[in-house]
Amino acid sequence: MISIVIPVFNEENNIGKLLEHLFENSSSKNISEILVIDGGSTDSSQQIIKKVISVTSSAVERSQKKGLDCARPDIVLLNSPKGRAKQMNFGAKHATGTILYFLHADSFPPKNFDELIINEVNKGHLAGCFRMQFDSNYWWLRLASWLTKFCWRACRGGDQSQFITKDLFNDIGGFDENYIVYEDNILINELFARKQFVVIQEKIYSSARLYEKHGVWKLQYHFLVIYFKKWFGASAEDIFKYYKKYIA
């Protein structure tokens, strides 16, 4: 079964919609739980999550009283120190499923994503992601989205989500918590080195909000600089300093 791990920090505009999307596009028989790991949100993220938990619990209870099958996976809200790597590792420690599925709060996976993931694992593909589509019609972002169909390391990123068996995740040692940013790519690099990565061709839809905030070309330039900084041996601290100065 799959444990979904969602790191959040001030995601009041997305988290409620994402949780409903997960319910509507998966089967409870395949999902152990949905772990939402909050890194100290100061907006209404936690209140929204708690409301979804309460409403879901009440709906399931009413259905059971009527003899109807309305099973939904449990949502577990946990608090962790801020930092996606720390939050996702914390969630993984509390996961009961044999497959971990790491998902950003502004990324919406395809219908039956759970079945698609399980099918790949059953084929022996122990880690991978979905092909990604930005919610933007800007030509460069459409091209960048199209390129994610290829299993190339340079086209990978956390907004495509990440599934991995818990055994493999633990063998690698989880996400490197030295990386405040770029943590997804560090794990992905290790998976490519082990030849343990597959791209599922169904699309996950992800927000282009960072591009809208900074401008497409400006942000793409900074991401490219970060990529080459890591390629040429920059430390996690150096990468974070650059990110904090130009993107955060």
Indicate residue ranges for each PLM-predicted region:
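Cell-envelope/extracellular polymer assembly enzymes that use nucleotide-activated donors
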Residues: 1-3, 33, 186
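Acidic donor-binding loop at a coil-to-helix junction in glycosyltransferase catalytic cores
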Residues: 181-187
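Conserved donor NDP-sugar-binding/catalytic core segment of glycosyltransferases
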Residues: 111-139
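A conserved acidic beta->alpha catalytic loop
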Residues: 21, 38-46, 107-108
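Short, well-formed alpha-helical segments that are part of the catalytic scaffolds
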Residues: 11-26
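Short aromatic/hydrophobic "clamp" motif used to bind/position activated sugar donors
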Residues: 100
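Conserved donor nucleotide-binding strand/loop of the catalytic core
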Residues: 32, 46-56, 73-94
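Hydrophobic helical membrane-anchoring modules
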Residues: 193-248
